[in-house]
């Protein structure tokens, strides 16, 4: 049965804390060996500790009188080889009688602890260089407020970028935009040369200017620009939202009016009154004291009015109306005094007066003869003659 020693104390060491090494006795002690017959059964079943002292009657031949010297040599080798994971020890010769005894194989295991620090060894010309790969702090030291428990600032906390942001924020908080560099160094808890590094850059790009040796003033956009820019962005966003809501309201109104017009077109009762009278047209300001023609033509009809300047003197005005889909109705509307009577006398049987039902108007409907339905209508006028006096039909 293998005996193990898990003692936390090393008697050869002067310090008093838990040893990082653990010793295991791998070779079994046979009870049949006469050399070990003097040991009591209780001593073989309990953990073997090197620090235990045996009676003088049991030292020979089990252990040599020079056991203390031999054991000190073993412990010295163990201390020198502390970084090794395994140490195998052979037999130790008896210094006096020439006898040798088997001590057993001792395995030295270094127990891990939170205080251990990982290191990487790199070989160089100058020798072995110790490279630091990581650092761990014990939880107890952090809780007890040791040296390792102090807060360590990261690189970003001491960067010029962060200091510049804090510096600009101090300028924003200043009433007139003027800042004392000494006060700034005290507030930011940095050396004054770091403040000078920031001011040199900001002065170089034209954002600040020095009023005195230790005072600077912001010379960028009013109210530091950034604040105004944020206000302007917020204002523009609100305007866009307002315009979008107004556009949505107008779209709803247009949709409602389109639906109302569609319902009027589909209503038979409303379609009976969907027309304009002569008074509705001539009452418009731009159509007063003008000669007006009302044309009712089918779909795909077109009107051509040649340029009167292309004609020979005197100027003549022509209007060509053509349609291949059906007849064309032309109504002459005029408010000149005596135009209606003169036109009726000259046209005679070639024209008849026709007005919408229930409307008393002197409008004149121009019609063609029954034998010349395919002819175009040509309307010509002189400066002294009315337009209706010169109308005639020509063969196409």
Swiss-Prot record:
Residues 155-220 bind DNA. Residues 236-264 are annotated as: Leucine-zipper. InterPro entries: E2F, E2F-DP_heterodim, E2F_CC-MB, E2F_WHTH_DNA-bd_dom, WH-like_DNA-bd_sf, WH_DNA-bd_sf. Keywords: Cell cycle, Coiled coil, Cytoplasm, DNA-binding, Repressor, Transcription, Transcription regulation. One of its GO terms (molecular function) is transcription cis-regulatory region binding. Residues 34-57 are annotated as: Disordered. GO terms for biological process: cell division; cell morphogenesis; DNA endoreduplication; glucosinolate metabolic process; negative regulation of cell division; positive regulation of programmed cell death; regulation of transcription by RNA polymerase II. Pfam families: E2F_CC-MB, E2F_TDP. Induction: Down-regulated by light. Residues 226-268 form a coiled coil. Residues 34-48 have a biased composition (Polar residues). GO terms for cellular component: cytoplasm; DRM complex; nucleolus; nucleus. Residues 376-391 are annotated as: Retinoblastoma protein binding. Expressed in meristematic areas, vascular tissues, apical part of the roots, cotyledons, upper region of the hypocotyls, trichomes, young flower buds and pollen grains. It is found in: Cytoplasm. Phosphorylated by cyclin-dependent kinase. Phosphorylation is necessary to target E2FC for proteolysis. It comes from the Eukaryota. Involved in transcriptional repression. May act by repressing E2F-regulated genes in mature differentiated cells, but is not an antagonist of E2FA. Restricts cell division and is involved in the coordination between cell proliferation and endoreduplication during development. May play a role during the transition from skotomorphogenesis to photomorphogenesis. Regulated by phosphorylation-dependent proteolysis via the protein-ubiquitin ligase SCF(SKP2A) complex. Belongs to the E2F/DP family. The N-terminal region (1-100) is important for both SKP2A binding and ubiquitin-mediated degradation. PANTHER family: TRANSCRIPTION FACTOR E2F, TRANSCRIPTION FACTOR E2FC. Heterodimer with DP proteins. Interacts preferentially with DPB, but also with DPA. No interaction with DPB when phosphorylated. Interacts with SKP2A, CDKA-1 and maize retinoblastoma-related protein RBR1. Component of a DREAM-like complex which modulates a variety of developmentally regulated genes and of the mitotic genes in proliferating and differentiated cells. Interacts with MYB3R3 at later stages of leaves development. This is Transcription factor E2FC. The gene is E2FC.
